[in-house]
Amino acid sequence: AAGREVWDLGLCPTPAVAWLTRHQQAAGGLMISASHNPPADNGIKVFAKDGYKLPLHQQKDLEQRLKRSVPLGCRAGGSSRQRHDLLKVYEQGLLLQLEPGQGRRLRVILDLCWGAATSCAVSLFEQFGAAVTILHGQPDGHRINVGCGSTALDLLQQAVVDQGAELGIAFDGDADRCLAVDHRGQPVNGDHILYLWGGVLDRRGGLPDRCLVITQMANLGFRRAWMERGGVLEETPVGDQHVYAAMERTGAALGGEQSGHVLWSQHHSIGDGLMTALQLTQLTAKSGRSLAALVGESFYSYPQKLTNVRITDPQAREAWRCNSRLRDGIAAAEAAMGRDGRVLIRASGTEPLLRVMVEAREASMVEDWSRRLATLAADELGRPGPQPS
């Protein structure tokens, strides 16, 4: 314990660590998790005493200290004890943000991804009143995020249709994000969740300046629909830290990512997949309509494709903008698509991948330019070539 008193929460969601760090007045919080990545890619998420993730420069400094085995000057003594009971405190914090019993009558399938959501998702949804069916419901560190959860919706989509459920929810490994599936088996991503939840808050005056914080990945259809209803959008780079920083700067109450990270300042300082899932279930139940109908009336989602190109050289991956042939290819794509399309290329923050996103009104144009740009990136920056996202 290095001179500190350590509370071990056991298996729990990342947002539970952050929330309890703040509400239990702890000096900090640590979460060991692969997040949404493959099981071998475990890492550490570090939270300050206010529940915020450490700023990137502090994370990098800590990482360098660990690599160099810098002595930390720890004191002797300290203690460690299990506090699994605190997970119930976190659960009650979530339920206090909901209207009791609103989930009643809804049949919901939860894909718990063999991960952290197995610790409390069933309890939460049952207390909320939903009839729950579970996929991948036991913790298994060898299978977490493998062909299941928010990064692989196929099994959930089939289960929702086969079992006649109203909706399905898929979490990632540490439950800080979620995606949904409607009763027809169609996926509902973070853009639609953010639009629908934002609409609810807007109607009851809970959205200052009618502003939502989005990332570069947000769909063109979402952007145009929100602005047509008089809303304001604040764009950030990909990453929940960037989203929350913009929310702090602008006073926005809600922000999120297409991947299913949604942040609500009334509840939390990071994305919370369980809160997002419960809020989506509540707004669907209160509407008296299907999630499919709500999504269908929200906005036309432009065809969008994300292709991952494996680039093992980190310098080449980070310096892709310096490649003139790749820049010329992007310019040609943007000229061909005009204002109804765009290209976004960025290096992954967690994997040796260059992510190539193409979006346009016509799906055929998306497929064509995705293939051409991903192949060009692989040829110019390194092999092997493109992988489907």
Segment roles from a protein language model:
Residues 1, 40-49, 119-122, 173-193, ...:
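Short Gly/Thr/Asp-enriched flexible loops that form oxyanion-binding sites at enzyme active sites
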Residues 17, 30, 36, 94, ...:
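Buried hydrophobic positions in well-ordered alpha/beta secondary-structure cores of metabolic enzymes
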Residues 37-38, 113-119, 175-176, 218-220, ...:
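Gly/Ser/Thr-rich loops at beta-strand to alpha-helix junctions
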Residues 42-163:
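Gly/Ser/Thr-enriched, mixed-charge loops and adjacent short helices
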